Amino acid sequence: MKIQSKATTVLERTSHYLKVGVLKQKPAWYDVVGAFPPHTDLTKKPKVLELKTQKPDPFTSLFGTSRNDGTVKTRASAFDRLQKNNSISRIPQLEFLEDELRDVFYHQHPWEFSRPKTLIENKGDEYKDCDWSHMLQFNKPLDGESVVQRTLWLLADSKKNGPKLSLFEAYDKARFEFYRLRMREEMNSSVSREESVMYGAVFPTTHLEWGVQKEQEYIDVWAKVASDKTKVASANRGRGTSAGSGADEEKGAETSIWESSFEISDAEEVVEEK
């Protein structure tokens, strides 16, 4: 395929067209591109492979170089491996103070994970729109992130206005503010519920209670069916011969309700086939 160089020579070609009269007026960009030409040629040129002109392979230079004593290096030495695994050559791990504070807070308060959270975010930096001079926000619920951002604000404010606080002191101050607000929130919720009950409010069952009720309905039906099948199984064992009655009773005592129900279903299938 021919090398595409038209984009890089647009100024020269336009000048030629203006000179020969193909273009009557200069384009609006002509003077700007002439005053500030591009510094980098982005044309992709094919790599010409000629004998003894190609750069040596770094693998060959590392593992295949000949020494003065006539030996050839075929594997990396301990020093080479040490330099290869050096921390300078590794990609640095990103560490943020916010992540460390979150780890500490949720390690101390694991039940905060059980509170419902909004997982839908537009940009992920909604906390920047909040005023962290106070912890309670209008458009954000009280959670561990409030403690983290409040701690960072206290640290920044103490450096400007003083007295200077350490990280531990700022975290403790934000944590106790969180405790007071959380206790006030739970107290208001409890008082509001008691007042509603006093005025005759009837609260519906929770999702957990509703699930237990539905499960109990199926358990009651199963208990009735299991009781009936147990009676049928005991009656069938009573009709056995007297010689094998002792062994059958011992075997029936060992079988469970589930096994007896399976035996009854198998017997019914045999009767239907006959």
UniProtKB/Swiss-Prot annotation:
Q: Where is it localised?
A: Mitochondrion
Extract one GO molecular function annotation from the record.
structural constituent of ribosome
A Pfam family matched by this chain, by name?
MRP-S25
Cell cycle keyword on record: no
Presence of the UniProt keyword Iron in the record: no
Q: Which domain of life is it from?
A: Eukaryota
Region Disordered, residue ranges: 233-259
Q: What is its main location?
A: mitochondrion
A cellular-component GO term for this protein = mitochondrial small ribosomal subunit
Q: What InterPro entries would the database entry show? A: Ribosomal_mS23_fun
Q: Which UniProt keywords apply?
A: Mitochondrion, Ribonucleoprotein, Ribosomal protein
Matching PANTHER family: 37S RIBOSOMAL PROTEIN S25, MITOCHONDRIAL, SMALL RIBOSOMAL SUBUNIT PROTEIN MS23
Q: Describe the protein's quaternary organization and the partners it interacts with.
A: Component of the mitochondrial small ribosomal subunit.
Family the UniProt entry places it in? Belongs to the mitochondrion-specific ribosomal protein mS23 family.
The name under which this protein is listed is Small ribosomal subunit protein mS23
Gene it is expressed from:
RSM25
